[in-house]
Amino acid sequence: MEFRRILQKRSKGFSLIEMIAAMVLVSILVPGISLIVHGTMMNIAFTNMAVFANMEADYAQRNFIKHINGVKSFSVTDGDLTVDKLTFTSYLEDAEYQYEIDDSRQIKYSINAPPAGILLQNVVKDTTFDAVNYVSKFTYKDRNNNNLSVPVASYTGTNVAFNSGAKSIAVPSGNSFADFVAGNIITISGSTSNNGTFTIASLTNDNTIVVSESITTEGAGDAITVSTEVHGVELTFFLLRGESFYKYTTFATIDKNQLDI
């Protein structure tokens, strides 16, 4: 008779020491893994916010550039060209566009008349955080890309005199040229001998402009207008996404001015 021996394989469990060692190892690794996972998820969230903010900003900037490229003229009405309002007429059927950065944290624009459509939301209009000032605004530029202190600075009077030796344009009193700054391109009209465009080299005071180009001596008498002209607009805006500020700046000028420069 043959006998077969049946071998049984018995599993052996963890010893107490091994179990304690495993528990200690897990307690060390789990917090570190949690921090890694948490950090990864936060990075993904911040990246997504930045991507979506860039997409929204790109859409707004492309619209803004397209509209400014088609400008026929900027409004000369008081209050229509400010840091938070921009009004202009387009070559497209002479439509009037108006952009506004309003107090409801939106950038809106309308064509010909209200209501205005929303271009961007959650825009920081003017706030200070950690001693840093965040301001969304329109900045107006002349032909030399210099900032205009006032979008359309202008003075008209019969007391404007020209001096060829000093290359100066002067009025006797007041603050007639207070809104003009060095570097601005000015347009003179109504003059007998000095109509045209000139570059402001300096301002002796609020009553005297010195230009870079030659001028002809001419006494007061004619009704002469000295004015600046907007050739481009810079739009700066801050988007608030989560707890982060995202800054965007874009500059646009009308197509005709780009060809003239």
Where is each model-derived feature located?
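Short linear sequence signals and composition-biased patches located at protein termini or domain-edge surfaces
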Residues: 136-154, 213, 219-261
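Short, glycine/small-hydrophobic-rich surface segments
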Residues: 46, 52-55, 68-93
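Type IV pilin-like appendage domain
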Residues: 80-154
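Aliphatic-rich helix starts adjacent to a transmembrane/signal segment
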Residues: 3-69
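Short, mixed charged/polar active-site loops
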Residues: 63, 94-98, 115-121, 195, ...
